[in-house]
């Protein structure tokens, strides 16, 4: 049967199954009184496999899109009555329902039921009993499953490609946290912005864009807190200083983060920290050079002090199999990066306080402080002498000199009702893993800390509407509902006896589907939609990187090509994932990335050919990385030692170049909507039951791309980022969807790549945006550039290589 595109939303309900055969029991599907008698004997004498747990899954061909809870001791007629809200962007001929029996290791299939996709396309509701079949599609006795489905095609969605549209836009539906109004958002590029770096960027209402300084603001927020300081991090390092700009000194700014937190705790401020407990240090990855998280050092530093620092492992939910539990606890992380404090009200005379939160990609640890100059060598005797970070070379050290690894990141400050949602997230996590109940009871401080309330008037043109999203499950957050019905009401997804918040992925999908003109993404990783990859040397169904984001982006571009409209997707990623670039883990991730790009370009080139358009697919979807190259200056830091000869380190030092590490997790849509958080575009971050993540999504209701382009803070922020990356501004950058803009940006980035990769070094790079070094053939196949099999100064393949020993669950 031919496969058809399901692109939209599938509402599905699995009610019950009937007359199942139980392979675990000698009683099989015998009459109930016989089954009970035989199973009682089995349990008494210790034969058989004990209590039977039955669950059902939903697949679009080989892509898993839903899973019920387990029903215990009802192996013949289990009743689930569970409903699913499924975003789909899949080619499929059938919706497949599989009934399984759970085992301590893995599961046993009872059979599968099939509903042809063709029957769903008219959008009518189908309520039906389906035969459960064996692998030969033959019915398994009288076994049946009762399901209900209705498909809503994305093209019939009144919000498809319409943008935010209205100040009444309610936010992303079916989520744990609702959208909040009357908020204020501060956007940060990198940990610091030097004075006078950003040129004049005009905004609406005669205003100009004003940059903000993340670590200075966090320093002030912690310093001025009077009641609470709550911090979560993948890594928190006590020895860093937050204030380092000699042109912008602050009283007490030379204190380390650890000393500052101890000082505040000794003053009576409740300081609670949840730092990821790197239990195994993910041995395979660690060996390849990923940075140590300092978790043990941080815990030891605060031991015996007034600071309550808890190392929390990424514990599984209570429901997984032995293998699943082991995978979660050893392979996945707590990745949220938040700071929550009480803060003075804007009118200084008041004694009342409010909650302010910080959310984004920046951990409070070493290697993160940087500015838009992203110097490789010129700060090694000052800002970065005691904060030298270079995990891509096995033996790198300040003694051997640069290049250091520059760090590009994005963060945000949230004020108003949204800040309280970040606080609630911390409280849920602390109650689950924090141990002692040390959370401040804010209702007891209601005279001092005002409850959630707007910080901007509705008529203020700078107001924001903001929504909080997460990837997290009941193993990491306290108080999730126990039943699928209650979970659905709370905007959560129920799985095989686990409750999951997967709203970050939902937020990305929702924003992409609404997009009208362009999308700009910066992310540390870009891989996924593996169900649509070509099966070259792999079985796509074995990879498990099932999130929809790359496929949604490709389908958005395809829809615009078919409609004869312009649309451009810009994606900035690191040159390679942090670590030794030749290592198995880095090469495996690059291989997944290449397959993801190729899947997207294949869709786009097929759409262009179908319309008879001869065009470069990079005019519609284009990838970049960041890098720097510096000529040697007099008076530069002189290292005491030399790198080992003929190594990546020595070659990079000689060539005076290195990548700028893109650690950001951000998407801008039409200059009107922005997502910032900790979540990468990979399955680990988007799954919900793997790495724990947090993100905000927001817009300014008075600055929407309705009748004219949006010119609010999000536009100014994108233009500031483009100035940082390109080293210039141009009027054409105000129309990113236009052919003129994308071709100009691509030309500049190709020129910068040629300068970066050249054997000659005549001058500093004028900008940092480099065209990602791949070619795209007319059929969408991603190729090496001529003479560019390896990244400069390395023996690391640009297109990556499939790993024979690294499990996909770890690298995807």
Curated annotation (Swiss-Prot):
Stable from 4 to 37 degrees Celsius. Activity is reduced to one third of the original level after incubation at 50 degrees Celsius for 30 minutes. Its EC number is 3.1.4.4. Residues 1-46 form a propeptide. It is an enzyme of class 3 (hydrolase). InterPro entries: C2_dom (IPR000008), C2_domain_sf (IPR035892), PLipase_D/transphosphatidylase (IPR001736), PLipase_D_C (IPR024632), PLipase_D_fam (IPR015679), PLipase_D_pln (IPR011402). One of its GO terms (cellular component) is plasma membrane. Keywords: Calcium, Hydrolase, Lipid degradation, Lipid metabolism, Metal-binding, Repeat. The keyword Transcription does not apply. Optimum pH is 6.0. Gene3D superfamilies: C2 domain, Endonuclease Chain A. Its cofactor is Ca(2+). A 1,2-diacyl-sn-glycero-3-phosphate binds at residues 335, 524, 663. Transmembrane segments: none annotated. The keyword Repeat applies. C2 domain is a calcium-binding fold, and the binding promotes the protein association with membranes. A lower affinity toward calcium can be anticipated for PLD alpha due to the absence of two potential calcium ligands. Hydrolyzes glycerol-phospholipids at the terminal phosphodiesteric bond. Plays an important role in various cellular processes. Monomer. This is Phospholipase D alpha 1. The lineage of its organism: Eukaryota, Viridiplantae, Streptophyta, Embryophyta, Tracheophyta. The gene is PLD1.
């Amino acid at each position: 049967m031919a496969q058809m595109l399901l692109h939209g939303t599938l509402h599905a309900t699995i009610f019950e199954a009937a007359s199942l055969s139980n392979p675990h029991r000698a009683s099989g599907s015998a009459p109930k009184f016989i089954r009970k008698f035989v199973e009682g004997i089995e349990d008494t004498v210790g034969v058989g496999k004990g209590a039977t747990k039955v669950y059902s899954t939903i697949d679009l061909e080989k892509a898993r899109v839903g899973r019920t809870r387990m029903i215990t001791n009802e192996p013949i007629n289990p009743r689930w009555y569970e409903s699913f809200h499924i975003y789909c962007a899949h080619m499929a001929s059938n919706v497949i329902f599989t009934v399984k029996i759970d085992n301590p290791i893995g599961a046993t299939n009872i059979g599968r039921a099939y509903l042809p996709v063709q029957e769903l396309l008219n959008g009518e509701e189908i309520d039906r009993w389906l035969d459960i079949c064996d692998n030969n599609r033959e019915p398994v006795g009288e076994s049946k499953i009762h399901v209900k489905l209705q498909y809503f095609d994305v093209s019939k969605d009144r919000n498809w490609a319409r943008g935010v549209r209205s100040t009444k836009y309610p936010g992303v539906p079916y989520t744990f946290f609702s959208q909040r109004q009357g908020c204020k958002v501060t956007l940060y590029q990198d940990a610091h912005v030097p004075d006078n770096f950003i040129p004049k960027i005009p905004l609406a209402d005669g205003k100009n864009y004003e940059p903000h300084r993340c670590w200075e603001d966090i320093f002030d927020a912690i310093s001025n807190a009077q009641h609470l300081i709550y911090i979560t991090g993948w890594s928190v390092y006590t020895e860093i200083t937050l204030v380092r700009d000699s042109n912008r000194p602050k009283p007490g700014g030379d204190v380390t983060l650890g000393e500052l937190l101890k000082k505040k705790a000794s003053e009576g401020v409740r300081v609670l920290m949840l730092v990821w407990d790197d239990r195994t240090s993910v041995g395979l990855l660690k060996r390849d050079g990923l940075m140590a998280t300092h978790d043990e050092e941080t815990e030891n530093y605060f031991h015996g002090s007034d600071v309550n620092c808890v190392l929390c492992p990424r514990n599984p939910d209570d429901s997984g199999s032995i293998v699943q539990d082991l995978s979660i606890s050893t392979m996945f992380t707590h990745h949220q990066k938040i700071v929550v404090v009480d803060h003075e009200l804007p009118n200084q005379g008041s004694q009342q306080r409010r909650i302010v939160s910080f959310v984004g990609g920046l951990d409070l640890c070493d290697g993160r402080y940087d500015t838009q100059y992203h110097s490789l060598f010129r700060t090694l005797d000052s800002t970065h002498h005691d904060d030298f970070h270079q995990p891509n070379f096995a033996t790198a050290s300040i003694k051997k000199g640069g290049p250091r690894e520059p760090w590009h990141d994005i963060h945000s400050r949230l004020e108003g009702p949204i800040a309280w949602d970040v606080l609630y997230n911390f409280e849920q996590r602390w109650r689950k893993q924090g141990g002692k109940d040390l959370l401040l009871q804010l209702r007891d401080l209601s005279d001092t800390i005002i409850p959630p309330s707007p910080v901007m008037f509705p008529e203020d043109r700078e107001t924001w509407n903001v929504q909080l999203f997460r990837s997290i499950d009941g193993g990491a957050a306290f108080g999730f509902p126990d039943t699928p019905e209650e979970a659905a009401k709370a905007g959560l997804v129920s799985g095989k006896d686990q409750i999951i918040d997967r709203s970050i992925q939902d937020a990305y999908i929702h924003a992409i589907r609404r997009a009208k003109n362009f999308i700009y993404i910066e992310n540390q990783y870009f891989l996924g939609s593996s169900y649509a990859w070509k099966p070259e040397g792999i079985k796509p169904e074995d990879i498990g990187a099932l999130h929809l984001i790359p496929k949604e982006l490709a389908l958005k571009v395809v829809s615009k090509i078919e409609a004869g409209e312009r649309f451009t997707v810009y994606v900035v990623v690191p040159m390679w994932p942090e670590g030794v670039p030749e290592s198995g883990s880095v090469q495996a991730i690059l291989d997944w990335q290449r397959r993801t790009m190729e899947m997207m370009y294949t869709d786009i080139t097929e759409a262009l050919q179908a319309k008879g358009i001869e065009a470069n697919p990079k005019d519609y979807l284009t990838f970049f990385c960041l890098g720097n190259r510096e000529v040697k200056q007099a008076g530069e830091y002189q290292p005491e030692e030399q790198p080992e000869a003929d190594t990546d380190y020595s070659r990079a030092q000689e060539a005076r170049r290195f990548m700028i590490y893109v650690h950001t997790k951000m998407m801008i849509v039409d200059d009107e909507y922005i997502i910032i958080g900790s979540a990468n575009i990979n399955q680990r971050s988007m799954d919900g039951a793997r790495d724990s993540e947090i993100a905000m999504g927001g817009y300014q209701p008075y600055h929407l791309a309705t009748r004219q382009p949006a010119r609010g803070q999000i536009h100014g922020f994108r233009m500031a980022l483009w100035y940082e990356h390109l080293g210039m501004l141009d009027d054409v950058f105000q129309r990113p969807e236009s052919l003129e803009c994308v071709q100009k940006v691509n030309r500049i980035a190709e020129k910068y790549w040629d300068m970066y990769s050249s054997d000659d070094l005549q001058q500093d790079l004028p900008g940092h945006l480099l065209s990602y070094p791949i070619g795209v053939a007319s059929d969408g196949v991603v190729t090496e550039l001529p003479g560019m099999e390896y990244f400069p100064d390395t023996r690391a393949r640009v297109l990556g290589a499939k790993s024979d020993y690294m499990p996909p669950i770890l690298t995807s």
